[in-house]
Amino acid sequence: RTNRNRNKITAKEQRELREKTIGIVGLSVGSAFAMSLAMERTCGALKVADFDDLELSNLNRIQTGIKNLGLPKWIAISRAIAEVDPYFEVEVYSRGLTSSNASDFFDGLDLVCDACDQVSAKALIRFEARKAEIPVLMETSDRGMLDIERYDQGVEGYLHGRISEEMLNDMMNANEWSPEFFNAFIDLSQASAR
């Protein structure tokens, strides 16, 4: 099924990638990442965390149909992955990423993708990734920014030094975004007008 990968990923690289486990927190935007990884088999297993149900407003970000409205996002995405590759391993965290399951979620990960909206989850991702020494990949829709935090290379601080220990703790206990938190993730002075 993946024989066309040979022109862009060598056989040796494919063998190495089969041993990798990638975590995705948030399955709206994260669903595209999950589907690409499954279609190309560019990792051996996925761990996905999302607690939300599929709503009509999600259909601009999730490639699915109205038949899946009301289902948990993880069910819709897991089914779509199984239709492409029924042998692809997907481990689901149906309550999303929480302080009670974060240690288990991060166990064995080689990379984590931050595709969630909750400020507390974003902070928890960075706290756990730094502890586990794995990179964080985050895409934001503002200006199409792709951010890579290399906690696997001994990086100090969080989000390239934009988040202090104190702010991270505040974020992990927050129920909503503050202007200060938002500015840490998207430099408001550089943000697009929209």
State the predicted function of each range.
Residues 15, 35, 104, 123-127:
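Alpha-helical segments flanking ligand/cofactor-binding loops in enzyme cores
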Residues 74-110, 116-123:
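A structured beta-alpha segment of the ubiquitous adenosine-cofactor-binding alpha/beta core
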Residues 48-85:
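Glycine-rich phosphate-binding loop and adjoining beta1-alpha1-beta2 segment
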Residues 110-194:
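E1/E1-like adenylate-forming module used to activate ubiquitin-like modifiers
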Residues 1-22:
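N-terminal charged helix/coil linker that caps or initiates catalytic domains
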Residues 18-55:
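Glycine-rich adenosine-cofactor-binding loop
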